[in-house]
Amino acid sequence: MGILKSLFTLGKSFISQAEESIEETQGVRMLEQHIRDAKAELDKAGKSRVDLLARVKLSHDKLKDLRERKASLEARALEALSKNVNPSLINEVAEEIARLENLITAEEQVLSNLEVSRDGVEKAVTATAQRIAQFEQQMEVVKATEAMQRAQQAVTTSTVGASSSVSTAAESLKRLQTRQAERQARLDAAAQLEKVADGRDLDEKLAEAGIGGSNKSSAQDVLARLQRQQGE
């Protein structure tokens, strides 16, 4: 009963472990799906980052052109003033320079906002990529641990089966030895009864007491006979 109880308890344990293994497997699959989803979103963010970098470059180039245009007009306006050119023309140039300055101010603000967004996106993309890489590494560790534990569980199951077989064999051997001992005792008792029946048991008892002759030769008898022959 003890062995059966132990096996029953162990069986319940294995069932519980199997249920936990199923839950862990499902958990691993869910984590893998989350990682795939995160990588897909990261790819989208990467494409948005490329678009943002392109907009930053376009804004930077536009600002450069505006500044170069403003500098060129300022130089020509100074030259016009030095040559006493028609004031209306100089005023027209001044108005264009003022318009360019307003455009430059607005574009500088646009570029600043774009650069802030770019820096934030780059940090987020880098951090997310690092986290995904860490999760993937941890996932490999989880898979390796799960495989190792499954192997250990298989070994444990085999060991329990072997222990049960050994216990059964030991009990069978003990029963066999007991039956053989009982059989030998019955044979010895039968032989003793046979000796009593034909008188051999009594003769053996008298011989042990030194009464009566014995047809058996002993080493002492042989040695005494040889000594007598030598004296003759």
Curated annotation (Swiss-Prot):
One of its GO terms (molecular function) is identical protein binding. Keywords: Signal. It holds the Pfam family PspA_IM30. The keyword Ribonucleoprotein does not apply. Transmembrane segments: none annotated. It comes from the Bacteria. Residues 1-18 form the signal peptide. Residues 207-232 are annotated as: Disordered. Belongs to the PspA/Vipp/IM30 family. This is Uncharacterized protein YjfJ.
